[in-house]
């Protein structure tokens, strides 16, 4: 059975010591969805939003968030990310925006939290930029899609 790595023998939260681990190439992908009214989505797609390019702003927010995950999640290590990618796709048939993030590095610990943070921050940025038009948008299905590298092995989410 797996144990919680961030809890010490006294039941206290602690940062995992990764100093003895070997560097390996690690990669993680995550996704999130923002569901909204068709009119809100059309405003984003057409580029007519008064605050500017929603997708470009959300992409930059996701990249910045991945780089600063260690400042947001208390027990995360600061990481030297070698790649962060955030892709946004309008899904008009579902009135959604799909966000997929990719984080990669060669290091001692995984990048799952960075990928999840990137997707989440991009979704939050879409909400922030569009809340004046629609307050009942829904951010949902934030999840890890895959991870590779490290001693715990690879993971691929079920469809």
From Swiss-Prot:
Enzymatic reactions: (8S)-3',8-cyclo-7,8-dihydroguanosine 5'-triphosphate = cyclic pyranopterin phosphate + diphosphate
GO terms of molecular function: cyclic pyranopterin monophosphate synthase activity; GTP 3',8'-cyclase activity
PANTHER family attached to this UniProt entry: MOLYBDENUM COFACTOR BIOSYNTHESIS PROTEIN 1, MOLYBDOPTERIN COFACTOR SYNTHESIS PROTEIN A
A GO biological process held by the record: Mo-molybdopterin cofactor biosynthetic process
Gene3D superfamilies: Molybdopterin cofactor biosynthesis C (MoaC) domain
Gene behind this protein: moaC
EC number of the protein: 4.6.1.17
Domain of life where this protein originates: Bacteria
Protein family membership: Belongs to the MoaC family.
Top-tier EC class: lyase
Coiled coil: none
Quaternary state and interactors: Homohexamer; trimer of dimers.
Protein name: Cyclic pyranopterin monophosphate synthase
InterPro entries reported in the protein's UniProt record: MoaC, MoaC_bact/euk, MoaC_sf, MoCo_biosynth_MoaA/MoaC, Mopterin_CF_biosynth-C_dom
Function: Catalyzes the conversion of (8S)-3',8-cyclo-7,8-dihydroguanosine 5'-triphosphate to cyclic pyranopterin monophosphate (cPMP).
Keywords from the named record: Lyase, Molybdenum cofactor biosynthesis
Metabolic or biological pathway: Cofactor biosynthesis; molybdopterin biosynthesis
Chain positions recorded as substrate binding sites: 75-77, 113-114
Catalytic-site annotation from UniProt: 128
Pfam families reported in the protein's UniProt record: MoaC
